């Protein structure tokens, strides 16, 4: 007999899943029955929040959904922060949990791990939450999840299986293929957008995370129109060192001026989030008069109306738009405008920010093609303002949007397992590192060769600065850090401490040469 738990593993394999992150418990043992016989790799984090963040990092690095297995109740609630981050950043994540036996649900009988309404709670953060009530539901629920991931704006999905359903017979249930894809670009909208492009003299492209797989057509469109390309945080790595690239945040006044002076703005895969566009100051982000929006999500297009809205995958829409553009390529001043904006944007930054950006550039240059996974720490904040990365999708962090501390270490582990050929660096602070520091053990178990770079400024210095800026005496911002090198060594992981950031490049190369997890602590005044 094949149980529902065993069938789940078979169906996940059929959907292309090769890795799951999870901590087994008494309510999910049946989910593990089929794992030993499958090709799916199981990675055991030290906390379920780590499972969620690992699934997130895996998804961002690979482009495939990250999957987490967690127990009923506390195991699931521990993943909510990670699911919130995935929801904010449109990351495909499938969280599969147990739930108490069907006859007991909602009765408050005091069973182990019981919640009053687990699925109702998850519906508030997941794109959808589905309870399996019988074996025959399982293929359809999974097909719905994977169809959503490929056809619209992705995010976290939750499927729960009651303990009594997990052990039910599931012989004869079969895989349901998912043929769903994003909608085709509307021909009339493409034609209207092409007309706007043809008449534009000062166009600008805004690229968001939804455009990170569209580098080739995006580059051709930028060159065709002579349009500077502004990259939000999740789009960094596009058009690396290209003369039309502007790897700077629209929060900077120079970038906002570039956008304000444009006679056409093409926004590709960006939600216009306040943390990317400084919606909190300077009067908020002023939408341009002529705006073309390309987004896979209809809800996103509805939130900020445009002159022309195109619901489609960014790469497909841009290819369609290029096919409608006639005449010679632009010979305008796009490269001049881009260069002037880059120069002015850098001039806005303080010497401290500039030094922190140089530290990130040191990582990039020492390890070409690296994936740098950031936590909320000073050099990450600085680089989110201005930083040019050399790999599309290779710079991501949780310092914008939902802004969860502790994201970096487990997300970097997920990324390293997804793309084992790439160097992976976790850039974290001493405060944020302590949120998920035990995942060093998971990195060692999984042989994930993450280089953990710890920016140790002995506290929450960014929060301290914010307090001082508004006249609040700093309180609670100086938690004493441990000796990170000794902690790493306790896990069996090599570590070194740097007092001079000038030695960082050599340390990174030493770390990479080991092929193992490694900790580099940088002490900062």
Regions found by a protein language model. Give the residues of each.
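N-terminal alpha/beta PP-like core and its mobile active-site loop of ThDP/TPP-dependent enzymes
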Residues: 1-325, 362-365, 449-452, 488, ...
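Active-site-proximal loop/turn and secondary-structure-junction residues that shape catalytic pockets
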Residues: 163-165, 378, 524
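Active-site flanking residues adjacent to catalytic metal/cofactor-binding acidic residues
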Residues: 268, 294, 374, 429-430, ...
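Thiamine diphosphate
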Residues: 104, 108-113, 259, 301-302, ...
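Conserved structured core elements
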Residues: 25, 215, 256, 312-315, ...
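A general structural motif
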Residues: 47, 107-112, 180-192, 211, ...
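Active-site diphosphate/adenylate-binding microenvironment
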Residues: 5-8, 23-36, 337-421
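Phosphate/pyrophosphate-binding active-site segments
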Residues: 136, 287-376, 499-525
């Amino acid at each position: 007999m094949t149980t529902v738990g065993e069938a789940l593993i078979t169906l996940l394999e059929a959907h292309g899943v090769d890795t799951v992150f999870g901590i087994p418990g008494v309510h999910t043992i049946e989910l593990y029955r089929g794992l030993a016989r499958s090709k799916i790799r199981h990675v055991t984090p030290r906390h379920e929040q780590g499972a969620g963040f690992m699934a997130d990092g895996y998804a961002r690095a690979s482009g495939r959904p990250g999957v987490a297995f967690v127990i009923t109740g506390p195991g699931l609630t521990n993943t909510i922060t990670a699911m919130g981050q995935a929801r904010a950043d449109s990351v495909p994540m499938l969280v599969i949990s147990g739930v108490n036996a069907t006859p007991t649900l909602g009765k408050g009988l005091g069973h182990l791990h019981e919640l009053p309404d687990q699925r109702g709670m998850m519906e508030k953060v997941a794109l959808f939450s589905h309870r399996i009530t019988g074996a025959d539901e399982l293929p359809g629920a999974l097909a719905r999840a994977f169809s959503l991931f490929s056809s619209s704006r992705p995010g976290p999905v939750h499927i729960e299986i009651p303990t009594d359903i997990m052990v039910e017979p599931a012989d004869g249930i079969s895989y349901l293929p998912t043929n769903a894809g994003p909608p085709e670009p509307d021909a009339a909208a493409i034609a209207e957008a092409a007309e706007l492009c043809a008449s534009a003299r000062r166009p600008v492209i805004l690229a968001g995370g939804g455009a990170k797989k569209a580098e080739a057509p995006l580059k051709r469109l930028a060159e065709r129109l002579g349009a500077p390309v502004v990259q939000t945080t999740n789009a960094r790595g596009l058009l690396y060192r290209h003369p039309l690239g502007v790897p700077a945040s629209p929060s900077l006044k120079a970038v906002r001026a570039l956008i304000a002076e444009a006679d056409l703005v093409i926004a590709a895969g960006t939600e216009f989030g306040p943390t990317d566009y400084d919606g909190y100051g300077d009067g908020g982000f002023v939408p341009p008069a002529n705006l073309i929006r390309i987004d896979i999500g209809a809800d996103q297009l509805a939130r900020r109306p445009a002159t022309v809205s195109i619901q489609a995958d960014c790469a497909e829409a841009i290819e369609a738009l290029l096919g409608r553009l006639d005449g010679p390529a632009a010979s305008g001043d796009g490269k001049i405008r881009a260069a002037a904006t880059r120069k002015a944007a850098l001039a806005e930054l303080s010497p401290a920010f500039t030094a922190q950006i140089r530290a990130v550039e040191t990582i990039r240059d020492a390890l070409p093609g690296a994936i740098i996974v950031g936590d909320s720490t000073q050099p990450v904040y600085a680089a989110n303002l201005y930083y040019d990365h050399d790999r599309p999708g290779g710079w991501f962090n949780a310092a914008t949007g939902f802004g969860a501390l502790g994201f970096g270490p487990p997300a970097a582990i997920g990324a390293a397992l997804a793309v084992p050929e790439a160097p992976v660096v976790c850039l974290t602070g001493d405060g944020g590192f302590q949120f998920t520091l035990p995942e060093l053990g998971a990195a060692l178990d999984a042989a994930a060769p993450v280089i953990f770079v710890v920016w140790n400024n002995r506290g929450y210095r960014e929060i301290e600065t914010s307090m001082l800026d508004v006249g609040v005496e700093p309180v609670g911002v100086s938690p004493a850090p441990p000796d990170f090198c000794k902690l790493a060594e306790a896990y069996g992981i090599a570590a070194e401490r740097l007092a001079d950031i000038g030695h960082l490049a050599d340390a990174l190369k030493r770390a990479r040469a080991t092929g193992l997890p490694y900790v580099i602590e940088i002490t900062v005044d």
